[in-house]
Amino acid sequence: MKKTLLNKFFSFSIGGYISILIGLISVPITTRMLTPEQYGIASIISLIVNILMLIVSLGLDQGFVRFFYEEKEEARGKLLFNCLYYPIFILFVIILGIIFFNKNISEFILKKQEFYIALILIAMLIFTLANRFSTLVIRMEQKAKLFSFFTVLTQVLNFLFILLFFKIYKDNYKTIVLATLFSTMITTILSVIIEKKIWSFKGESNFTKRELLKFSLPLSLTMALTWIFQSSDKIIIKIFTGMYEVGIYSAAFKIIALISIIQNGFTTFWAPVAYEKYSKNPSETLFFEKVFEYVSLFFLVLGAFILMSKNLIILLLGETYVEASKVMPMLVFIPIMYTISETTMLVIGFKKQTKYFLIISITVALLNIIGNLILVPVLGAKGAAISSGCVYIVFFAMRTYYSMKLINFKFKLKKLYLILVFMLLYALYLTFYNNFLYTIVFGIILEILIFIVYLSTIKEMYFKFIKKREI
């Protein structure tokens, strides 16, 4: 793994690290501005936008990623156009549906009728679609510094707009929703202007709209199932316990989102690098095995530290959201297992074996729904967190299993699973008990165990990177 590769990773990630610092400032302020109920409403609106985006995109954003490097550079604008063609058509249909069913949508979210909700959803859909592809363009061109710039700009603008709209709306969901909308709008417009060459849609693509859709549509179904897996928890919490618990759950996710920023930094860097590496040498496995090892070590250490620091969440979120500190521990597994799985599963995409994505998505979606239906009525948001955390471990295991069926990777899984057992027990303890001394002691023991189990990996990383040696 060469120094230039690491430089590229840190260039992609630097925006995430700055965003974490911004988040540490903005999250405590935001949670003190809004009650859990209003936070919950904003979260449900965001959830609906994400659902509709799955329908609108038809998986063609993934098609753009898959065929980007196989397309001639001068024709990538046309590839972008072909990937946007069907989503734009579907977007207009969805907009008509939102207008027609606006009363039902408003009743579901607010328990009263407000056409304003329909306008917000329409605006957010338009700019979220444009933002997804404008971000992908920068990401696939591997313009790391520009990507980091927009990551930071989005966070800064979002925070500033929250402060602005709070003066107008006070404790109201509109404060967060409008801040998200306007920050997305500005960064999208700027990124399209900067990348105007590819957005001119020029050239003759090697791939037809039908060919792109044929590849992407199965992924769209998989992504829909993945959404059910990832988001059914909030819907079930709303049905069984109400907006207060949704707000608590969403606040706990705000803490996890700070880890997810690092996750996004890695996955943004990793996907194009991995595809490029595979296209040059499909038989190369050592590179992927080493990345798996290093990423596992980093995220396990980070996860144990976050769990050990759980009591700081009370200070961070404020007394109103104190229950979120009991929800957060099991949610830690979401970014950890997702990120580690990204290092093992890309071969499924390489080999175009999308049926495995479908099998995985159906399995984990069903498991999470069953887990939530059993645990949420009894434990509320904590039950949803337990279900999600456990199912994400299954998610990682299945992704890795099918990947290793396609290529004979030699991932060192035993030591990862050993640490996961102890981390899972630790997280469950923190979900139900809050003894400060035991929290710290158990956390330190877990960190020591990680360092012992991964000692050979730590030594290897030291000599390769600290000593500035290359593979």
Ranges and model annotations:
Residues 67, 127-150, 199, 332-363, ...:
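Membrane-interface junctions at transmembrane-helix termini in multi-pass inner-membrane proteins
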Residues 56-72, 140, 256-293, 345-350:
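Helix-loop junctions and terminal segments of transmembrane helices
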Residues 1-5, 145, 173-179, 189-230, ...:
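Interhelical loop/hinge segments that connect adjacent transmembrane helices in multipass membrane
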Residues 4-61, 90-99, 124, 155, ...:
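Signature of the first transmembrane helix
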Residues 8-23, 154, 176-191, 195, ...:
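Transmembrane helical elements of multi-pass membrane transporters/channels
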Residues 81-110, 163-167, 189, 288-338, ...:
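Alpha-helical transmembrane segments of multi-pass membrane transport and lipid-handling proteins
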Residues 409, 430-471:
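Membrane-proximal transmembrane or re-entrant/amphipathic helices at the cytosolic face
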Residues 119, 149-197, 363-367, 381-402, ...:
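Hydrophobic alpha-helical transmembrane segments
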